[in-house]
Swiss-Prot record:
Principal location listed in the UniProt entry: virion
Organism: Rinderpest virus (strain L) (RDV)
UniProt-annotated stretches for the region Disordered: 449-489, 504-525
One term under GO cellular component: viral nucleocapsid
Name of the protein in question: Nucleoprotein
Length: 525
């Protein structure tokens, strides 16, 4: 048996192992298409600023071709470094495209004020054809997307500080698009706006230079459909991270935006580890989880073997991403989602409408959190040097704060999970209903006895008083038994509950309501 378990462990390890580079053949190259990337041919700020202005207008052209749009975006993304050409040549290794760098310089003979640098021949006509477009015939107005503020016609500046701020503003909006462009492009607008507000408040960007929605939609769609552009952006992020010492301000901003980009599309895997394993609840000892725990272990080892590209596997369309799908560990994922919903309010809006979602294990995760609330892990307590008295004190405080939190919490979290029931709970619900009926009968007897004793004690009253009113206790006129304000508050709440219960018992429709039935499929969507 020991050898079988050892062989099983080796099998799981080799099964999820990525293929090694071997054989006599080299890298497989596809049919490449040429991407023209204009770069500044001198160190003048005017040249860079004028080039940025032309590129922004090119991207906003609705009729721009895909390869030309990719080249313009690569040029914009690399304008913040001192030598954009060297950067592009160093980090670009794409089997699908061939990048052709073209230097641009200032010129007074072209419409754009720029021309392609050459040693002899004039390239003014070629520069005009590249940077400008023909106006449509018939007097039709071309719709171009630039900035939300239509008063901004150009962004050409002369000083380096102003250029860096404008460039940082444009780059921030482009990099923010990468976070959701691949996974959820249709619902990305809200999160992108929150990121923009954050950097505006931090004075990293200029709020007046907010790009138009149509411009952003064009770039988002291009990022989603062009793998080569995403490869360049990921390579640029990794190159910035490897740079030692202090980095330029724009580079630091890109690294900050990268925190929203990494692990995009890997939420199921990351959340399963966070809520299912790191919480270390005893439910992990179930036999049902044994196989999936070994699967998660193999995936974690595979994630580490992939190195620095692992967090970007979905963005880079790596085929190995399918191994990390929640369908490979459905029971553990369902359990982890139940734990997460109870621990974090932000998990309440998560969509659980998956074919492999298991409500029973989801509820198992919920119950583990609820029943383990306030308990201290003995292993962790021993590592931290926590005594038994301190652990008991922590448990009491945690239980009190948990009750206070539950009393204030309302809404989505409980409404999403209260319907999750299994067929095994039928007997429990039946026993609970019997207990409820017995409790109702007992309360009715006590209420009847109380109302009967009140009749002997009350004075003659000409007004007709209903029996339900006689059983109600006036909290305001009840004499105080002690001077403890907390005790008085609890007593008042208890009396109010008794009043509400008495009113319910007098309701003739009591007991006629049929239990409400929920449709799991409808509520999960």
């Amino acid at each position: 048996m020991a050898s079988l378990l050892k062989s099983l462990a080796l099998f799981k390890k080799n099964k999820d192992k990525p293929p090694l580079a071997a054989g006599s053949g080299g890298a497989i190259r596809g049919i490449k298409h040429v991407i023209i990337v204009p770069i500044p041919g001198d160190s003048s700020i005017t040249t860079r600023s004028r080039l940025l202005d032309c590129l922004v207008k090119m991207v906003g052209d609705p009729d721009i071709s895909g390869p030309k749009l990719t080249g313009a975006l690569i040029s914009i993304l690399s304008l913040f470094v001192e030598s954009p050409g060297q950067l592009i040549q160093r980090i670009t290794d794409d089997p699908d495209i061939s990048i052709k760098l073209v230097e641009v310089i200032q010129s007074d003979k072209t419409q754009s004020g720029l021309t392609f640098a050459s040693r002899g021949a004039s390239m003014d006509d070629e520069a005009d054809r590249y940077f400008t477009y023909d106006e449509p015939n018939g007097g039709e107005e071309r719709q171009s997307y630039w900035f939300e503020n239509r008063e901004i016609q150009d962004i050409e500046v002369q000083d380096p500080e102003g250029f860096n701020m404008i460039l940082a503003t444009i780059l921030a909006q482009i990099w923010i698009l990468l976070a959701k462009a691949v996974t959820t492009p249709d619902t990305a607008a809200d999160s992108e706006l929150r990121r923009w507000v954050k950097y505006t408040q931090q004075r990293r960007v200029i709020g007046e230079f907010r790009l138009d929605k149509g411009w952003l939609d064009t770039v988002r769609n291009r990022i989603a459909e062009d793998l080569s552009l995403r490869r360049f952006m990921v390579a640029l992020i990794l190159d910035i991270k490897r740079t030692p010492g202090n980095k330029p301000r724009i580079a630091e901003m890109i690294c900050d935006i990268d925190t929203y980009i990494v692990e995009a599309g890997l939420a199921s895997f990351i959340l399963t580890i966070k809520f299912g394993i790191e919480t270390m609840y005893p439910a992990l000892g179930l036999h049902e989880f044994a196989g999936e725990l070994s699967t998660i272990e193999s995936l974690m080892n595979l994630y580490q073997q992939m190195g620095e590209l692992a967090p970007y596997m979905v963005i880079l369309e790596n085929s190995i991403q399918n191994k990390f799908s929640a369908g490979a560990y459905p029971l553990l994922w369902s359990y982890a989602m139940g734990v997460g919903v109870e621990l974090e309010s932000s998990m309440g809006g998560l969509n659980f409408g998956r074919s492999y979602f298991d409500p029973a294990y989801f509820r198992l995760g919920q119950e583990m959190v609820r029943r383990s609330a306030g308990k201290v892990s003995s292993n962790l307590a021993s590592e931290l040097g926590i005594t038994e008295e301190e652990a008991k004190l922590v448990s009491e405080i945690a239980a009190y704060t948990g009750d206070d939190r539950n009393s204030r919490t309302s809404g989505p979290k409980q409404t999403q999970v209260s319907f999750l029931r299994t067929d095994q709970g039928g007997e429990i619900q039946h026993n609970a209903s019997k207990k409820d009926e017995a409790r109702v009968l007992q309360v009715r007897k006590e209420t009847w006895a109380s109302s009967r004793s009140d009749r002997y004690k009350e004075d003659t009253d000409n007004e007709a008083v209903s029996p339900s009113v006689k059983t109600l206790i006036d909290v305001d006129t009840t004499p105080e038994a002690d001077t403890d304000p907390l005790g008085n508050k609890k007593s008042a709440e208890a009396l109010l509950k008794l009043q509400a219960m008495a009113s319910i018992l007098e309701d003739p429709t009591l007991g006629n309501d049929s239990p409400r039935t929920y449709n799991d499929k409808d509520l999960l969507s």
